[in-house]
Amino acid sequence: WGVGVSSKWALEQAHNMYGAWPLNVGILGRAAGSTRAPLEEALAGGVCGFKIHEDTGAHPRTIDTTLTFADEFDVAVALHTDGLNEMLSVADTLKVIDGRAVHAFHVEGCGGGHSPDVLTMAGRENILASSTNPTLAYGINAADEHVAMIISAHGMNPELPSDVRMARNRVRNATMAAENRLHDMGVIPVTSSDALGMGRVDDTW
């Protein structure tokens, strides 16, 4: 689904789209395989780094292959970890990362990532932790509104009890409340809109 493609043609269209504006824009390519060939194609197409996403497979081989390739070519890797812990726990993911530099998306966890403890990835020397903004700023209605947002953004069915349980499992008041303070402390130094997923840029900025 719409979490990105990295073909040379698609990247060319994306780069051309930004040509009319005096902006420096970096495009992340999809990292969803266990071999280098798709990464090589995307890098040749002009990506500035790669995004590993749980919806297309944040598996051990994918993480290791992408980080190894990125280190070789000095490009960035953003990681949206395995929210259902189907392949890896947060401890397993940290072991695969093995001290290499990575940008951890959705580190609070409501937008995705290892449940319930992805927040433990924040504050590590090799990990640039970031929030996406559905949980910022934290207000009195934040927890209540997120089940519907998760279901909508991820194509779930609100009539299926299993989908509702999965959505509710991501909503944790304590980590939502802690997130703002962790930003103030610099433990989570980055935020972004996630505007095409669980995002609401107009509420945060």
Indicate where each model-derived feature is located.
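Metal-associated gating/positioning segment near the N- to mid-region
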Residues: 1-14, 88-89
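Active-site mouth loops of central-metabolism enzymes
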Residues: 2-3, 23-35, 52-55, 169-170
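Short acidic active-site motifs
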Residues: 34-38, 62
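Catalytic cores of alpha/beta
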Residues: 37-41, 91
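Active-site core of metal-dependent hydrolases
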Residues: 52-180, 184-205
